[in-house]
Design a protein with these regions (language model features):
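Radical SAM enzyme [4Fe-4S]-AdoMet core and its adjacent flexible, acidic
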Residues: 48-49, 70, 101, 123-254, ...
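Local cysteine-cluster metal-coordination motifs and their immediate loop/turn environment
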Residues: 28-40, 250, 277-286
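Residues that line or immediately flank small-molecule/substrate-binding pockets and catalytic motifs
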Residues: 40, 81, 131, 196, ...
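Processing junctions and N-termini across compartments
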Residues: 23, 27-30, 245, 273-276
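Short, charged low-complexity linear segments at domain edges
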Residues: 1-18, 249-267
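Conserved alpha-helical substructure of the radical SAM core
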Residues: 1-118, 310
Length: 339
């Protein structure tokens, strides 16, 4: 995060607004990926699931998203799903309008269909393509969004490749490096991000990493970032995987991001995973990146996390006098110092 962007985000928080918004713009997805948190029964925190929501299409979707952005004025909007490319016609209208508003947008997709070339001209847009490991495993998990189809559909773009590390991957030595060897040389790849699988509390799925596998993944990433410059993760961010936030109240990402589901009304809490995520096994790269920022000192004994706590408190007070604003989460807690 650049200094100017950080100051803008701080200003939003002090004004009682959240600087980031994540929108599940559709409930539809042609994939059926094992372990997908969006389709967990408790993702929305109640009896209704994502597939049961009434989502929007056409001009109603475009107007609904623009109304949210104009009302809440986030600096950054993540467009997720489902898969956003299910609504690619709406995005062809929406993305240029968001770009004109000065909003930075990230579209997270499986790239199961061609990404319109016109999107490559939008200065405030990132395309993040989800890829689950090497081709044999990925193609089995994410068909029809196979390697061959992805390579064809991202042609002419510079995308971010995002891989979620799973327990299955870490059972084979050298797996992450093989992944880097394939994707790093590709001209279509701008950078590569890695997260780790985040289960719900009590889940023991094949995707879950053991403590030893988690530490091995950290060690591998710290080594690989020196060999592959496209691995766009700093050492501080990678080390945070060893000490994730203890709860959403201690997670700067959760506290500063408003997440809405496909009806554009239902809030997803306590963070983008919804349900009851096991924070002790959190693998969210965005969370780790912001925690790395939170633990930096701005003065002896004063971390950015402490400043953020005070700012969130001020923002909550301010937001009470503006009914139309998004209320900052009332359960914000101190971002713990790390030694």
């Amino acid at each position: 995060m650049k200094r100017g962007e950080a100051l803008q985000a701080w200003g939003r928080v002090l004004a009682g607004r959240l600087p980031a918004m994540s929108i599940e713009i559709t409930k539809e997805c042609p994939l059926r990926c094992p372990g997908c948190y969006a389709y967990e029964d408790q993702h929305l925190g109640g009896p209704v699931t994502l597939r049961q929501l009434v989502d929007r299409k056409g001009s109603a979707l475009v107007e609904g998203v623009l109304a949210l952005v104009d009302r809440h004025r986030p600096l950054h909007v993540s467009i997720v799903g489902g898969d956003p490319l299910v609504r690619f016609r709406e995005l062809e209208v929406l993305l240029p309008l968001l770009n004109q508003r000065g909003v930075f947008v990230q579209v997270v997709t499986s790239a199961f269909r061609p990404i319109p070339l016109a999107w490559a001209e939008l200065s405030r847009l990132n395309i993040c393509v989800s890829i689950d490991g090497l081709q044999p495993e990925h193609d089995e998990r994410r068909k029809p969004a196979t390697y061959d189809r992805i390579l064809k559909n991202i042609a002419g773009h510079r995308v971010i490749v995002h891989c979620t590390i799973t327990g299955q991957m870490m059972k084979r030595a050298g797996y992450l490096e093989e992944f880097m060897q394939f994707w790093s040389p590709r001209p279509e790849v701008l950078k590569i991000w890695m997260s780790m699988f985040t289960p719900q509390r009590g889940q023991e799925l094949p995707e879950c990493l053991t403590p030893a596998e988690r530490q091995q993944a950290i060690d591998d990433l710290l080594r690989l970032r020196r060999l592959y410059p496209k691995l766009g993760m700093g050492g501080r961010t990678i080390r945070e995987f060893a000490r994730p936030p203890a709860s959403p109240a201690e997670c700067l990402f959760a506290q500063t991001t408003q997440t809405l589901s496909a009806d554009l009304k239902t809030r997803i809490t306590p963070c983008q995973f919804g349900g009851d995520p096991d924070c002790s096994r959190c693998g969210c790269m965005a969370s780790m990146a912001l925690q790395a920022v939170a633990h930096r000192e701005v003065a002896p004994g004063i971390t950015i996390g402490k400043v953020a706590l005070i700012s969130l408190g001020v923002g909550r007070t301010v937001s009470r006098f503006r009914p139309s604003g998004i209320r900052v989460a009332p359960n914000a807690a101190v971002i713990p110092d790390r030694t």
